[in-house]
Amino acid sequence: MKRPTRFFGLHAHSGFSTFDGLGYPQEHINFCLDNGLDGWALTDHGHMNGFAHAYLHAEKLRKAGANLKFIPGCEMYVHPDLELWQAQYEIKKAAKKGDKSAIKAIIDAHEHLRTKLVAIVDGDDETVNLDTEGANLTIENEEETKSSKFYDPIKRRHHLVVLPKTSEGLRRLFGLVSQGYMDGFYRFPRVDYKMIKEAAKGGHLMISTACIGGPLAYEAFSRLQGYEFDRLTPELLNDKSIFEAVQSGVGNTIDQLVDAV
């Protein structure tokens, strides 16, 4: 393989991504310089607490003559529709109490979401124990985001890497991160596609699909319940029906992402 003449890393976690990254941002930047990278983006999970560390170190090195571009970013926790999630959450609480009239009232109040809400009520998805499911957990849990064995619409979240293209984009990214904590927090700070679409107006943000915790991988996993990741590719290649089912879901998700940005 021909060695690339330029390389710019757009997805990295420092020690500020608890249990998912190591080292201070300064150490990452030094590594990039020592190994000839042209640039580096810091994309910690759900927040930008490492931004000041990285920015000040990158500026110090730039003034000393170093040629490395730093981009601040965030690997955000995303739910497709937080309004839908809130209604699902209220239905779960009512179902736990056996309050069918409350469930009907919730569905009636969200007429435009009726089909999806009825599917949740009639489905056999995991019922969350709202007393013990760990509302204070704010560290990355790979068993929930990177496994085909897990599916629960209440705990559902995906990863998306969001990067600013301009100074205005950086301002909007800060706002988006804050919005996740103020308006979308449930165990993790979450945003939805509507929030991203609003922040991305004017082309100020770049979005990537992140890792196997991203929405595209989720669509594949949700159709392959019980599969270990290392079985995924062989099964997709050997069974056309599985491949077509996965492609259908992935296609719908791609449409959502494109519409959002």
Listing of model-derived features with the role each one plays in the protein:
Residues 1-261:
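Phosphodiester-processing cores and adjacent nucleic acid-binding clamps
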